[in-house]
Amino acid sequence: MRQRGFTVLEMMLVVLLMGSAASLVIMSFPAMQQDTAERQLQRFQAQLEFAMDSGMQNDRLLGIQIRPNGWQFQVLQSQAAETRSSVAHSDRWQGYVWQIWQPRQAALGGQVPDNQPLTLRLPPPQEWPPTAEPAADPDILLLPGGEITPFTLIFGEKDDRSEVWLRVDESGAIATSAKGGAP
């Protein structure tokens, strides 16, 4: 009587060979690229476009909190009734609070190196960084209809003379320093 299939030893050998081949492939990858300002701009732009599309498709109000050391995407969520009175400025959003937005299968937000601080420019009379605003509110709003708070985000390198920036108008059109122009 002949047996069909593979033995456990044969299967273990195949797994070992596949693991060895995978480790050789991974070792042949080039070293990680440096986190240049251009790379940070591309990462932010891709995340912004994803957030704008997702907000329109899912009818959600999203926001972006910008800090000199990075950015974070937020979503406006309903807050439980018993915790509304304990949160400062909770009446501002009428029972809703800003929470970190982490959609499935997407890692949003980012940190920048210390030598590449972010600078956000908002149209007058808005100012950044906010002085009287609570820290939990986003600096930029992405509305479900496709509108967005107009802004210019500068990815600075202290030792670099060229300025790397991204500008977005109220309709969501994006312009970058890679395409030329001035911020």
Curated annotation (Swiss-Prot):
Post-translational modification: Cleaved by prepilin peptidase.
Transmembrane domains' residue ranges: 6-26
Record membrane topology: Single-pass membrane protein
Keyword tags: Cell inner membrane, Cell membrane, Membrane, Methylation, Transmembrane, Transmembrane helix
Residues where N-methylphenylalanine is found: 6
GO biological process, one term: protein secretion by the type II secretion system
Tagged with keyword Metal-binding: no
Tagged with keyword Hydrolase: no
Chief location of this protein within or outside the cell: membrane
Disulfide bridge map: none
Outcome of swapping residue 10 to A: More than 90% loss of type II secretion due to loss of interaction with PulM
Propeptide: 1-5
Cell compartment(s), UniProt: Cell inner membrane
GO cellular component: plasma membrane; type II protein secretion system complex
Described function: Component of the type II secretion system required for the energy-dependent secretion of extracellular factors such as proteases and toxins from the periplasm. Part of the pseudopilus tip complex that is critical for the recognition and binding of secretion substrates.
Subunit architecture: Type II secretion is composed of four main components: the outer membrane complex, the inner membrane complex, the cytoplasmic secretion ATPase and the periplasm-spanning pseudopilus. Interacts with core component PulG. Interacts with PulM.
Protein name, entry field: Type II secretion system protein H
Source species: Klebsiella michiganensis (strain ATCC 8724 / DSM 4798 / JCM 20051 / NBRC 3318 / NRRL B-199 / KCTC 1686 / BUCSAV 143 / CCM 1901)
